[in-house]
Amino acid sequence: NYFGGSVANSNPLVTSSGTAALGADYTGWNNKYNLRLCGYQFNNYGTLLYADSSIKFQLSKALSFNLAAQSGTNNQLGNSSNALTNANLGQISSNFIGVQGVINYDWFSLNLGYNNVWGSSSAYGSGSIVTPYTYGFATDPLYTTPYMSGLADLGTAGTAYKISPTLTFINGNLSLAPAYTVFNTALAEWNGTQEYDFVASYN
């Protein structure tokens, strides 16, 4: 069991009996194409269906492009009540899409991401994604989730844009990755939020 307080803007003191998950992964075209399909049943916290796909174009030894897309839906799937509706926070009803483009050239790469999350204005967070196990960790798969908090962490529907270049040095052992993310959200308190990050790593 886990406590249901781990969603944004709320603290319903309700436990869940757990989560069931099922997924499939396909890779082809010499490992340059990938398709993933996943389903999660967060007991008492809704159902999440998710898919993403990516393809890589290797133009030369140093130059490559990656294109990716993702989509999903988050709802109650026949359950009339859950931890959020019982706490009068609205039903779970969300849809989301995202696209990502990455260019890699030798020691430099540039990552551009976009996400759109939407739902009923009467839903939790005006259509926010409910992900109890990733909230606060910035580990959800949205392309625009930055280091600190993304749309799921903010508990709101809306759009997000992210740009993140990466520079590598010393035969790829040193990596410097600044990032900028901006959010246009359905909830006024988060609208216009910007996050700047900088990650340095050495192997």
PLM features: what roles do these ranges have?
Residues 13-19, 26:
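Solenoidal tandem-repeat scaffolds enriched in leucines and small polar residues
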Residues 12-14, 153-154:
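Short Gly/Pro-enriched turn/cap motifs at secondary-structure boundaries
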Residues 7-12, 146-148:
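A short acidic, glycine-rich active-site loop
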Residues 25-27, 102:
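Well-ordered beta-strand positions
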Residues 39-203:
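Outer-membrane beta-barrel pore domains
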Residues 22-24, 37:
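Functional cores that coordinate and move charged inorganic groups
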Residues 30-36:
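Short, surface-exposed connector motifs at secondary-structure boundaries
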Residues 1-6:
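Outer-membrane beta-barrel channel domains
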